[in-house]
Amino acid sequence: MSYAADVKKELTGLIVHAGNAKAELAALMRMNGVSTLGFDQTIRVQTENAAIARRIYTLLKETYVEVEVEVSVTDHNHLSQHKSYGVLLKTKIDEVLDDLGIDPFGLHPEVPPRMLNQVDKRRSFLRGAFLAAGSVNSPERANYHLEIYTTHEELAEQLMIMMQEFDLPSKISERGNGFIVYLKRAEKIVDFLQTIGATQSMLKFEDIRMMRDMRNSVNRLVNAETANMQKTAIAANKQVSQINLIIDTLGSLDILPKKLRDIAKARLEYPDETLAELGEVLDISKSGANHRMRKLTQLATMIEQGIDYDLTKL
């Protein structure tokens, strides 16, 4: 099961207060779409998620006690087990749709203010909208993304305004024949999940994200350390070659000034050490070791280029 499916499974198991059930139900039916069937004007809400179908059925039965509701299942492909679920509202259709502020013909996609006049109602509406038409990438993926899709621009703008109220700075983008309201920042996706009541999914998102960020930090440190080690090894090999050139030219390191002689011998004895570590061997600072090594490099360069040199001035 995908992470998004886990989130929706958690949300469909939440117990919703009766005062907020209508807001969630309004979003579920509005975002899934309602269609009229047959001469008896039965209303059908279709979804491919069995848990969401059960959620719509349960909320309808609990909110409107006397309505007649059924769930139908359509098997589209026996091999892939692809099924869709229809929630059929058979009685009190006009009453229910009017109470939920839903226009069955889609001519008025905006949500009536009375459905959203309390903070918890707006939370519930966002939850229903996500259940019906939302998705979220797994926190394991590099690109964090949460979105809600709607075919109506007016509804997309309402969703964006609702999300902004909870400090969720979403954006709207056109996609196909509709619009998506989306979040890209991981911390805001976490806040959205908490806002709509997906607490366990939110904690899982945070745990996975923290582990992923930690692995990335460790990898960056390892890469940086590896690069530094390679850089140190290249520099040390060059220094050893320069010291050997000096020995070949002078016949011995003994005629060098003591400070240069000591650093040269230390480098030959410890070819893999950093300059700071060579400084510790000689009981001098890193800058002191670096200064002496530069003097040896200067001498080796003069030898290579055939330039006259004075050892007493090094």
Swiss-Prot record:
Residues 274-305 bind DNA. One of its GO terms (biological process) is regulation of sporulation. Involved in cell division and chromosome segregation. Keywords: Cell cycle, Cell division, DNA-binding. One of its GO terms (molecular function) is endonuclease activity. PROSITE patterns: INTEIN_ENDONUCLEASE. Belongs to the WhiA family. Pfam families: HTH_WhiA, LAGLIDADG_WhiA, WhiA_N. This is Probable cell division protein WhiA. It comes from the Bacteria. NCBIfam families: DNA_bind_WhiA (TIGR00647).
